[in-house]
Each structure stands twice: as structure tokens, then as C-alpha cells.
Amino acid sequence: MALVRSLLGAKKILSRSTASAAPKGFLAVYVGESQKKRYLVPLSYLSQPSFQALLSKSEEEFGFDHPMGGLTIPCPEDTFINVTSRLQ
């Protein structure tokens, strides 16, 4: 019986971890040129000039009509990782 409760508890944790909503304090962004990948970034990045430059690029390309339904940053994934790794 304990094993069944343990398995049910694990299922609840997995379903919560795959939720589409970003956790408190984070923003979900989609990054990539052809294949988009979802990243969660801390809200504190929004005040950083280098991250704001990525947001400006997104605004220039998409305006406020993002094809993924969320914020899309049109740059190569490695560029995004390079920029955000400097912010940590």
C-alpha cells in the first residue's frame, strides 16, 4: 500500500513540473530561429541591458504578435545561452 501511495505522489509531482505556467519569479521565453525551445528566465533579467537588447530584437521582428503564443526571441540558441550566462 505504501508503494501505491509513493507512486501516486510521484505522479502528482511530475504533472506539476510539466505545467505550462512559469513559476513565480520567472518568465517563459521561446528561443531559436527555426526550432524553438522554451526557457525560463528570472524576472531580474528584464532590467539587464543585454537582455533588453534581445527583447528589442524580438519587438523588431514580431511586434506584439508572437507566433508561439508567448515571448519569442529570434536568435540562435547558443547566442541566448551566451548572453544569459553572463547575467548569472
Swiss-Prot record:
Explain what induces or represses this protein's expression.
Answer: Strongly induced by auxin.
Provide the primary localization: membrane
Q: Write out the GO biological process terms.
A: auxin-activated signaling pathway; response to auxin
Q: Which Pfam families match?
A: Auxin_inducible
InterPro entries cross-referenced by the UniProt entry: SAUR_fam
- Locations listed in the record: Cell membrane
Recorded GO CC terms: plasma membrane
Membrane topology, record value: Peripheral membrane protein
- Keywords annotated in UniProt: Auxin signaling pathway, Cell membrane, Developmental protein, Growth regulation, Membrane
Entry function: Functions as a positive effector of cell expansion through modulation of auxin transport.
Member of which family? Belongs to the ARG7 family.
Q: What name does UniProt use for this protein?
A: Auxin-responsive protein SAUR21
Q: Which organism is it from?
A: Arabidopsis thaliana (Mouse-ear cress)
